[in-house]
Amino acid sequence: MLKKILPVLITLAIVHNTPTAWAAEAPKTDSFYLPKSLDLSPLRLHNIESNPYGKDFNYAQQFKTLDLEAVKKDIKTVLTTSQDWWPADYGNYGPFFIRMAWHGAGTYRIYDGRGGADGGQQRFEPLNSWPDNANLDKARRLLWPIKKKYGAKISWGDLMVLTGNIALESMGFKTLGFAGGREDDWQSDLVYWGAGNKMLSDNRDKNGKLPKPLAATQMGLIYVNPEGPNGKPDPVAAAKDIREAFARMAMNDEETVALIAGGHTFGKAHGAASPEKCLGAAPGEAGLEQQGLGWANKCGSGNGKDTITSGLEGAWTTDPTHFTMQYLSNLYKHEWVLTKSPAGAWQWKPKNAANVVPDATDPTKFHPLMMFTTDIALKVDPEYKKITTRFLENPEEFKMAFARAWFKLTHRDMGPAARYLGDEVPKETFIWQDPLPAANYKMIDSADISELKDKILKTGLSDTKLIKTAWASASTFRGTDFRGGDNGARIRLAPQKDWPVNDPAELHSVLAALMEVQNNFNKDRSDGKKVSLSDLIVLGGNAAIEDAAKKAGYSISIPFTPGRTDASQEETDVSSFAVLEPTADGFRNYYDAKRNTLSPIASLIDRANKLELTVPEMTVLIGGLRVLDVNSGGSKAGVLTNTPGQLNNNFFVNLLDMSTKWTKSPKAEGYFDGYDRKTGKLKWTASSVDLVFGSNPELRAVAEVYASDDAKEKFVHDFTKVWEKVMNLDRFDIKNN
């Protein structure tokens, strides 16, 4: 919902209001003293120890015990039980809760998968204090009695989305359904929301382009400025902003129009007076006595008729608590003229406007209709106009489009439908869910697994090629929105099969050999068993690592659980999967400088974060993959071993060897040559990603563990453990059970 700007907030501190003297003595991070120091905090986020429910807590199992109908009944009661401390407009909190759910989900962006409703991040800074989220702190407080009642059985993330659904349904709109499964976070995510901390500053660069991975056009907004770009009431320019922002949040033009038109059917905007004169600090800056609430309003009653949120004022329809076609009909039947709200914000009113909208608190008073600049944009933009007029002429089509778009908005960041919980999950599947076919065959058993591993190793494929393929397939996973991974074997499909990082020609030959093994195993069987290519890809990687460990003198067996299935090209949205392409993968020593804004090292940390790795896991994984010789393009950078293809700790031993002197390579930026200090002979080449494990004190501390004489077996054990983790990151069918 394109709502709610608070121009009063110019800057935002993401800490509690603390006396200056105390702040000066507070502990500081390394970056305070050394701004160029490497920040490893993304790999320490959401540690299980920070979860008060403990390491054995299983949210999926808790949710399955929830009486969802009882929760819905309680939500319906809250909707129409107005509280004196924050009265409901028109006696119904429904529109308020729709905005809460929308803004919780609407931070999602396609390029890095960050944002969205999963985790309930709206509770934390900076989102809690964003101007676009003004007064949503009260919405969550209204829901606290319900959260308190059901506790661990329903997360804040699920409760907020469910409440948005119930709000829509209570006002006469039929939603598509609801899926639970959003597990709460316990701290703020580390997300790049834009350059600087000035609220409402333009996120575009000096060339007018919105840098990736950003989606919102201004700092502190969910999408775009409803007054127009940077507060300028230009509907044509606003349409351009809308199209770009919504596209970066995975919405096409039709979905965008449906969401705006559907959302603005309900409720009103609040701009009773000047925010600069009336409002206090946002929650993150408010005093302790406010107990986490912000934007205290000192003007009038401070709420109700005196409420100030966005600075814009009024409603889009004459019936703001029911689903009608009025938004679209009002948009076209009136000539709209520019005006200002009581707070001084740009908005639009009908020419010769009549007082037809009932007051939110006094049924004897009426006001004119209003529209945002972003609403008028849907009328003046040629493509949006085609859609809005079609929806106006076809109400049932509009209803279905809004229902589908709302479901997508509130579930897009949850990943595949295998993560969905509850009895209200729609039966229909959608291409944006990255659907997978169900297995209609019996799974392979332990004897079959041993047989298949043996056959894979006898194909003539090298261990290196098998490991590279398994890594390329599984490492597309990103825990930010649970997309990617090996399940589906989409590495054989467009666009993944052609990504440069995957060495397409080599990949094709490996997949062809694995498919031959698959076909030979599956054909003419009477026992009903089959093996998927996606299972074989992982099994091949496992077999190769076991073989590499054997060559190094270690006997290991990597656990394997079958059950992956193979998606078709028709089940794969090429443009949607394109955003998963690794333009940098430090684990394969790959970096495309032309397509990256992060450095190779920062890109490694970012990818490790998406793979849900800790600092030790990232470290041991790098060390193992280097000696297994799996670099993209066959690069020997960082292959610090004389026995490539053997799983051992040589990478760390040789990296920390003081007989090597490292110098910058004259051949390529970001690469280094390692020379023997005595003879001057070239021993190794390495990238910045390799050398950071000897340069950064924290990474070196972990590297020293694995380089130690008594850690050889530990290294092999730890590497295979984290390898297994990465191969199974997308196995939600296992995790939820």
Curated annotation (Swiss-Prot):
Keyword Transmembrane attributed: no
Tryptophyl-tyrosyl-methioninium (Trp-Tyr) (with M-249), cross-linked positions: 102-223
Cofactor stoichiometry and binding remark: Binds 1 heme b (iron(II)-protoporphyrin IX) group per dimer.
Top-level EC class as recorded in UniProt: oxidoreductase
Binding residue positions for heme b: 264
Active-site annotation: 103
Site (Transition state stabilizer): 99
The enzyme's E.C. designation: 1.11.1.21
Cofactor: heme b
Any GO BP annotation: cellular response to hydrogen peroxide
Modifications the protein undergoes after translation, according to the UniProt entry: Formation of the three residue Trp-Tyr-Met cross-link is important for the catalase, but not the peroxidase activity of the enzyme.
Single GO cellular component term: cytosol
Keyword Heme belongs to the record: yes
Cross-linked residues, Tryptophyl-tyrosyl-methioninium (Tyr-Met) (with W-102): 223-249
CDD domains: catalase_peroxidase_1 (cd00649), catalase_peroxidase_2 (cd08200)
GO molecular function: catalase activity; heme binding; metal ion binding
Signal peptide: 1-23
Catalysis performed (reactions): H2O2 + AH2 = A + 2 H2O; 2 H2O2 = O2 + 2 H2O
Keyword annotations of the record: Heme, Hydrogen peroxide, Iron, Metal-binding, Oxidoreductase, Peroxidase, Signal
Role, per record: Bifunctional enzyme with both catalase and broad-spectrum peroxidase activity.
HAMAP family: Catal_peroxid (MF_01961)
The protein's assembly and partners: Homodimer or homotetramer.
Family from the record: Belongs to the peroxidase family. Peroxidase/catalase subfamily.
Protein name: Catalase-peroxidase
Gene field: katG
